From Swiss-Prot:
Residues bound to Zn(2+): 94, 97
Keywords: Cytoplasm, DNA-binding, Iron, Metal-binding, Repressor, Transcription, Transcription regulation, Zinc
Family label: Belongs to the Fur family.
InterPro entries, sorted: FUR, Fur_C, WH-like_DNA-bd_sf, WH_DNA-bd_sf
Binding site for Fe cation: 88, 90, 109, 123
MF GO annotations: DNA-binding transcription factor activity; transcription cis-regulatory region binding; zinc ion binding
Parts forming coiled coils: none
Name of the protein this chain belongs to: Ferric uptake regulation protein
Top-level taxonomic group: Bacteria
Gene3D superfamilies (UniProt xref): 3.30.1490.190, Winged helix-like DNA-binding domain superfamily/Winged helix DNA-binding domain (1.10.10.10)
Subunit structure: Homodimer.
Residue ranges of the region described as DNA-binding: 1-85
Region (Dimerization): 86-136
Length: 136
């Protein structure tokens, strides 16, 4: 997803475009990995001195509810990234830098076979480790 796609989603849901929202979205697009709210606040503070965590978190939750960003817990902290594809997939997440790699394989079909009679409504699979760059 790019910034324009995200802005389109905001507008389709009756939400207004603001420079702050665009700048937050730009951070996600540029980073393309899991980042925490503190990092977003630090980057945003350069153009919006004194921007509050409330503003950051309010927009993070809005973006998440609209499917613009994804979230995960890494090292006991909530982190966020831009939604990367429209197809079903999972992620490998580097525990050191937060970089992600798409895993196109999904084990849910095999799991469904071992759970006859149940309806699975949703699932999430994340694989954690250390990426090639961080192993050096």
């Amino acid at each position: 997803m790019n910034t324009n796609d995200a802005i389109k989603i905001l507008k389709e849901n009756g939400l207004k475009y603001t420079d702050k929202r665009k700048d937050m979205l730009d951070i996600f697009v540029e980073e393309d990995k899991y980042i925490n709210a503190k990092y977003i606040q630090q980057v945003m503070d350069e153009n919006y001195p004194g921007i509050s965590f409330d503003t950051i978190y309010r927009n993070l939750h809005l973006f998440k509810d609209l499917g613009i960003i994804e979230n995960t817990e890494l090292d006991g902290e909530m982190k966020f990234r831009i939604a990367c594809t429209n197809h079903h997939h999972h992620h490998f997440i580097c525990e050191k830098c937060g970089d992600t790699k798409v895993i196109d394989y999904c084990p849910i079909d095999q799991i469904k076979l071992s759970l006859p009679g149940v309806n699975i409504h949703k699932h999430k699979l994340e694989v954690y480790g250390v990426c090639e760059s961080c192993q050096d």
